[in-house]
A protein has these predicted regions:
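Amphipathic alpha-helical protein-protein interaction segments
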Residues: 66-109
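N-terminal, charge-rich alpha-helical recognition modules
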Residues: 1-72, 76, 87
Length: 109
């Protein structure tokens, strides 16, 4: 192996470990904003992508359990958005679309 291959392997291992940490943080109740900050992602969607990559590497039974847990969180989030008295209707609609995108990504194979 040459130095470039070694660096690529290390980077891939680091990426896998970072994805796994995103999954652990989210499963532990952290928001995707908090996960992104903790892991140095520039955007929240990068933390969500990492979470989903790690989830898909888990055994089928564990994936199902993690998906149920995440869907419950997303349902609570959607309920909170709908119940908010402080958000404008456009903001409610935008946030609910975001929650729906998160659901779609979570359930994608």
């Amino acid at each position: 192996m040459d130095a470039v291959t070694d660096r690529s392997d290390i980077r891939a291992e680091d990426d896998l470990a970072r994805d796994d940490k995103a999954l652990r943080l989210r499963a532990g109740g952290r928001s995707f904003v908090a996960v992104a900050k903790a892991l140095g992602y520039g955007r929240t969607h990068q933390a969500n992508d990492a979470f989903n990559r790690a989830l898909r590497r888990k055994p089928a039974g564990e994936q199902e359990s993690l998906r149920r847990q995440e869907l419950a969180r997303l349902n609570i989030l959607a309920e909170d958005v709908r119940a908010s008295q402080q958000l404008e209707p456009d903001d409610v609609a935008r946030r609910l679309r975001t929650v729906e995108r998160l659901r779609v990504m979570l359930l994608a194979e």
